[in-house]
Regions:
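Surface-exposed, secretory/extracytoplasmic low-complexity segments enriched in Ser/Thr/Asn/Gly/Pro
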Residues: 1-191, 195, 210-212, 260-262, ...
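Exported/periplasmic cell-wall-interacting domains
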Residues: 63-64, 172, 186-270
Length: 270
């Protein structure tokens, strides 16, 4: 007996033509020292059928791919290997600094680029950008803060430009942040800071003309033994700090202010 075929040759031909049409594009994602390629082989996996049986791009499959890119290349809050000013390799995690792909917008953009057959080299749509797109997204210009050593070092292109002692509190957060804004004449506690560099929420780096690091260290050692932090609840008449902030001698703060830019990474560790 004769059995009718499930697919006829003209249907196969139509499928082949549609597949060639939908996959005739190459899109290369540029992540600086890394690349990802979307080509015919990959796009074939994103094809589905509509109610009429015609081949179409499956947007959900594209969204899944963009999610994989984000999992691989987003860096906000991730663990980073960092070389400290005293040549130690440590792991720094947390904070708000880093790259973040806007997944819904990038899904739409990639979907449309494939439909439009726009062969291109592109970067994803980002919800947040950072200073460097390399694997080392901190780069070589950054502010380094050691909470344990109470020390701040500003590097520009790998060269230390500012190196100073600091005053902190036990609530000063660690992690990787960025300079969010530069302002002058900001009210901080019972003083006005001439140089204010915010790095997260209401916290910032600023200078205090009356800051005496030696006096603060003596007070700490007398009151709290070997603690590494300033206790802002103690009665310190020469202290005007704000909980969680990083305070510098005024001269160092002025120099820091002149040399940093918004968006510059701030690496804080214990």
């Amino acid at each position: 007996c004769y059995v009718n075929p499930l697919i006829y040759s003209d249907e196969l031909k139509s499928d082949c033509e549609q597949m060639n049409e939908l996959t005739d594009v190459v899109i290369t994602y540029d992540f600086s020292d890394r690349k990802e390629t979307v080509d015919r082989t990959l796009i074939k996996e994103w094809l589905g059928r509509d109610e009429d049986g015609s081949l179409i791009l499956d947007k959900d499959a594209i969204a899944s791919y963009v999610g994989q890119l984000a999992a691989k290349y987003d860096t906000v809050g991730t663990d980073r290997t960092f070389s400290t000013y005293d040549n130690r390799d440590i792991t720094v995690s947390g904070g708000t600094y880093g790259w973040l792909i806007d997944q819904p917008k990038e899904t739409d953009a990639l979907y449309q680029a494939i439909l439009d057959k726009k062969t291109q080299v592109r970067e994803p749509v980002y919800a947040q950008k950072a200073a460097s797109r390399d694997t080392n997204d901190i780069g070589y210009s950054y502010v380094e803060v050691s909470l344990t050593d109470r020390r701040l070092v500003l590097y520009k292109s790998g060269t230390p430009v500012v190196d100073t002692g600091i005053a902190i509190s036990s609530s000063t957060p660690d992690g990787v942040y960025s300079i969010e804004e530069k302002k002058t004449g900001v009210s901080v506690g019972n003083m006005t800071a001439d140089c204010w560099l915010s790095f997260t929420d209401d916290l910032g780096i600023y200078g205090d003309p009356g800051l005496n690091l030696s006096a603060i260290t003596d007070t700490e050692e007398d009151s709290f033994g070997s603690t590494d932090y300033v206790d802002f609840s103690s009665d310190m008449t020469d202290w005007t700090g704000t909980e969680g902030c990083i305070v510098l001698p005024e001269e160092a703060a002025q120099e820091l202010y002149q040399n940093v830019e918004t968006g510059m990474p701030v690496v804080i560790y214990k």
